[in-house]
Structure formats: structure tokens, C-alpha cells
Amino acid sequence: MSKRRIEVGETYGSKAKKDPEASSSSAAAAAGTVAQILGGFVPNKQPPTMNPLTNTPYSQRYQNLYKKRIALPVFEYQADFMRLLSLHQCIVLVGETGSGKTTQIPQWCVDFAVSKGRKGVSCTQPRRVAAMSVAQRVSEEMDVKLGEEVGYSIRFEDCSTAKTLLKYMTDGMLLREAMSDPMLDQYQVILLDEAHERTLATDILMGVLKEVIRQRSDLKLVVMSATLDAGKFQQYFDNAPLMKVPGRTHPVEIFYTPEPERDYLEAAIRTVIQIHMCEEIEGDILMFLTGQEEIEEACKRIKREIDNLGSEIGELKCIPLYSTLPPNLQQRIFEPAPPPNANGAIGRKVVVSTNIAETSLTIDGVVFVIDPGFAKQKVYNPRIRVESLLVSPISKASAQQRSGRAGRTRPGKCFRLYTEKAFKNEMQDNTYPEILRSNLGTVVLQLKKLGIDDLVHFDFMDPPAPETLMRALELLNYLAALDDDGNLTDLGAVMSEFPLDPQLAKMLIASCQHNCSNEILSITAMLSVPQCFVRPNEAKKAADEAKMRFAHIDGDHLTLLNVYHAFKQSSEDPNWCYENFINFRSLKSADNVRQQLARIMDRFNLRRTSTEFTSKDYYVNIRKALVQGFFMQVAHLERTGYYLTIKDNQNVQLHPSTCLDHKPDWVIYNEFVLTTKNYIRTVTDVKPEWLCCLAPQYYDLNNFPQCEAKRQLELLQQRLETKQYQKGF
């Protein structure tokens, strides 16, 4: 490997205290300024004895955590921050990962909010894992119970109460709150953390909040970023003041591969083993991979390799980290490394993570970082209406963030599993904003619910392509969420209340008409959680046989329903899941999602009903309800043996994971998967007459491209027009 030494974060160090707006001439002067503004507030390095939030003495744990807090780089900037917060409505803050900005600054904002009244503080995170784990940590630092004064809110899970003062939440959840409270009146301060990630929800929130702060002079907005490229945020928010907080940084040695790696997963696992065996300094390893399956596979293989090497090698504890892990397993990343063994061989932990560990979470003790140079990214093609998660090269900014994780506590090493030439010449400088590569159906529905009708002139930081917006409007019009003038319909208003894609929301609401809303609730919940079928490499045949025991002849949606029913009949037994190769966590999560969706249905008086199981219409009604949401995601079997998607004319195949043992003429599909081939995944057999009768606007044959499907539908249309056939339907 070639190597080059760099100083991670050196840009901060030289500039941080020279910023005229953010730095103070002396701590005493700053404290005096803040004291004048906030009526006596002076930063205190001595821990107080009484907790004003609970009126009880602080615990010993609080005292211990306080000593760690005052050692964080951000702590000496407390007076500067409080001064800026008092003088300005919007602040842009750049703080490197590990500076303490995510845990400390929201707590200072609580002090500010309490001094002004009793309104709360919201701090958004792009990822649910970060929202949960940071809320847990901050509740400990504030010596309060999680879910009371400090809480979190993520999709399908709200751990907060009316008295919560500080709420960590995903950016999407704050956007959802704005739909019912457009002025966000319950908040005194809103912090947008990790704004540099430019997620879809964060970009929309910035546009919404820019307008809200114009109308609410008392609301404070803090935009926090971990990268130096803050000028764009300042400019967007009318030249808001910039505050820079340096992180603790140590030199990081960067190693590149001389040649591109053919199999980055194999190379990454090999590098972990080499580091553990050959590096003579203590320190943990952080390895970046792209998703849950890859991470679980890597953990198994690393464990197997280490076990095969025998007891002479120090213990290596492998800990996975991805967004759908339950909170108790997420906390394992903070466990200490194993001690050295009897012969002195070093014990380490290796955290195998998605890009959540780039900036959202800080793991102390990491000295070695392995960066294969890939992450999963959403991509969208509006012409064929296909959105997919693809494994894509990361940006230079992400690569720098990753390497910086190695220099947090001492000098470290970063092993980049790509060439230096690829880093310099092939990687983009920054990650492309998600709004420019996403299906905007959900976003447009939310903006319409917020009362923002003129989408063309909405103040996007980076405006999406007009074609993408038009596709979203077209989708919502066909789903009857918008009328022909683009106005929100009553149905659209109800759809917007469900934390679901518009198609799923429409399907769920329409299921009431087909007397199967209980079953569609279960299917929707199963589609909203990670894949429930487990297929380990060492037991693929047994896993496939187990899956076929749940298979339904009409397709995968009904197979998912069978799995959910069987899980409930087993009394939610984890052992039953293990024996049947079912992911227990996915099913528990689906059960929770189902309960949340049922509550929303009850709120809108949407009846929860079922067709009699013995009726011949039981499964027919469910399939008709599926069509009501997914009539735009239909494929027709051609004479070639391939499927052709309706209207978009994409050649596709059924995904190998399907339970269908035959090829129906017409199928609806849940997702389009782009790999080396085009696949449609989670498919169900449907009747073409349902398409024509349940979605006549979309299946208007006058606006149909010439294809085999059109000819079939024309013949069907003629039959439908005869009285006898209509009666039969």
C-alpha cells in the first residue's frame, strides 16, 4: 500500500478562534456578555448540586459525566454560542465530529429556552440510530429519565411526553410535526444537525424553516454541519453568522491500495485480520460497509477467521452497527475492548458500520479505519419512474470524514481500499444532495399539506429537476391525492397523515372499501420493515424450504401476510422465528408499525374489517386493495418470456426471491431492483380487469403506448363493455 500522512482537521485549528463573530477575547469578557443578556448566566466548570428540572440532587453518575463534558472541545465555546444565540435568529455552526456539538449545544439551548419560558428544543438527525443513541446519552448527562425531559421521535416510535424539553428526532419527523403545527409553536429553538448530509427531509425543512423564522421572530434556528463547506448554508440563511468549533485531532496516516480491489468485502475482512494480528499498538477498528446484509456477513466471517487462528491471537469482538438495530444492541459500540490475553496479545473490538459512523456517532478508542470507498445511495430516474438503492462510490468529503474517525484520541491509521488516483480524480468533492436523486411523491404531498402550493418557486437550496416534480404531481393526481388543478384533495390530506409512501397510504385507505383493511394493515407493516426472511450462506437450502412453507400461490404480498399471521399464532416466539429462518426483530418491528398505523386509521374513522376467511373473496379482496395503491407498478408477461412494465416499457424479470412458482400474465410489484439485470421484487398476480375497473384514469387506452399489453387490454375492454361480463365482475 502507498501511504501519505495528513493532518485531519488542521483547517479548523488554525481558524477556529480567529472568527470575529464566534470567538471571544477572553473567557471572562464572554461570560460577562452572556451574563448581561441572559440575566446572570456564566459558564461554570464546577458541577451544580441540584437538578432544576427534577428538583432533586444530581447523581454521582451526573458528576462523573460532567467532568467528561467540560473536557469536550465545544465546552469552552459555551459563552460565545449563548451570546450568538441571543443576538441572532439563525446561526450556522461548523463543528467536527467528536467536538461534542450534538450532545452539548442542544443542552445549552434548553437553558436558553427555559430562561424564555417553557417552550421546547428540537434537534434533528438524518438517522434514527443517532436520534435514539444521542437522546439516551443526553438524558444521562442531564440526569433525567429518557422519555420525560429528554426524548426522541422516529418513524413509528415516539419516546417523549408533553413535558419533554429536548427532543431528538429524525428530520422527517419534524417535517411531519410541521404538517399539523405549521409555525412549530411548541419549539423555542430548532437545531438541524448533520446538515452537510443534505438529506431529502433536511433540505425541505430548511426551506420550510426559512419561511417560519420570518414569521416567528422568537424562534431560533441553529444549522450544524461537520464539514467546512458552510458558506452555502450561510448564504441560504441570509448571511447568518458562522461559528467554528474545532475537534480534537491527531495525525492520521492514510494508506491506499496500489491497484483497485476486485472484491472490497473480501479485502476489508482481510485488512481487519492483518491489523489485529500485525499492529503492535492498542486500538479499536472501525470498518465501513454498505448495508445490513454485508455487515452481518462480514461479522460472521471475521469471527470464523479469528476462531480458526487459535488462542495465541488476542480476542477480537465484532460489533455490527446499522439503522434497524434495536437500541440495546446499538449501545454495544460503546463497550470497552476485550483485555489482552495471557500471553499479552492485544484484545480489540471492531465496529462494522454503515456510513452512520462517519459523522452521526462518535466511537472513542478507534485508531484504525478501513474505508472500502462505497455506500448505498438512492438514485431516481424520473423517465421510467424507478428509484433504487445502489452501492456507489463515496465523495471526497465522506472519505475525509471517515479517515478523521481514526484520529480522535491518538494518532491513527486509515486504510483506503482504493487507489490514490481514484481518490483524486474519480471521486466527487461532495455527496450529491438527495433531493436531486429522489422520487419526490412523498415530499410534494407533505408540501401541499403544509399549504405550499407553488412548488416551482419554493425556496429549495438546490431545486430538483422540473421533470422530477412533474412526475411526483402526476403520481399524486393518479392516486387522487391531488385534483386536476394540483390542489390537495380530502383523500390526499388523509394520505399525508400516514408516515408511508403515497401508494401504501392509498392502498391502506382503499382497503376499507374491499373489506380487508386488517390484512392490508399487516401487509403494509411488513413492507415497512427490513426483509423478514433470513438466508444464511451455510443453510441456504433449509432457509428456502422454510420460506416455501409460508408461500402463497398468488404471490409475495400474501406470503408476507402468512408470515405475520404465523408469527402472531406462535405467540411472537423468538425460537419459532429462529427455527423458521425468520428475522424476529423485523417481525416485532412490523407489529409495532401495525399498531401505529391502526391508531392513525382509528383517528380518521377508517374501519378495520376483514372478509370471512372461508369466503372465496378473502384473497381476491386483498389483491384488489393492492391494485388500488400499485396500479402504476404493473408488469405484463410478453411472448419473449420477459415482463414489460406498463407504460414505461422496461424489460424486467421476477426477482429470484419471489415465492411464485409460475409466471402470471399480470403482476403488481413493490419495487424495481437495479442490479446487473432489471428485477421486480415482491410481486403478486392480479387480473387485468381489476386494473381497468379500479384505475380507469391510468388505464385510459387512448394514452397508452403500443405494446402487447395494450392489445390485451383492448380485447378485455370490449368484453367489459358487454352487460354479461360486467355482471360477472
Curated annotation (Swiss-Prot):
Listed GO MF terms: ATP binding; helicase activity; hydrolase activity; RNA binding; RNA helicase activity
Top-rank EC class of the record's enzyme: hydrolase
Domain Helicase C-terminal: 271-451
Binding site for ATP: 95-102
Disulfide bonding pattern of the chain: none
Pfam families assigned: DEAD, HA2_C, HA2_N, Helicase_C, OB_NTP_bind
SMART domains in the record: DEXDc (SM00487), HA2 (SM00847), HELICc (SM00490)
A cellular component term, taken from the record's GO annotations: precatalytic spliceosome
EC number, as in UniProt: 3.6.4.13
Catalytic activity: ATP + H2O = ADP + phosphate + H(+)
Biological processes per GO annotation: innate immune response; mRNA splicing, via spliceosome; positive regulation of p38MAPK cascade
Task performed by this protein: RNA helicase involved in mRNA processing and antiviral innate immunity. Acts as an activator of the p38 MAPK cascade.
Family: Belongs to the DEAD box helicase family. DEAH subfamily. DDX15/PRP43 sub-subfamily.
Protein name as catalogued: ATP-dependent RNA helicase DHX15 homolog
Record organism: Drosophila melanogaster (Fruit fly)
Gene from which the chain derives: Dhx15
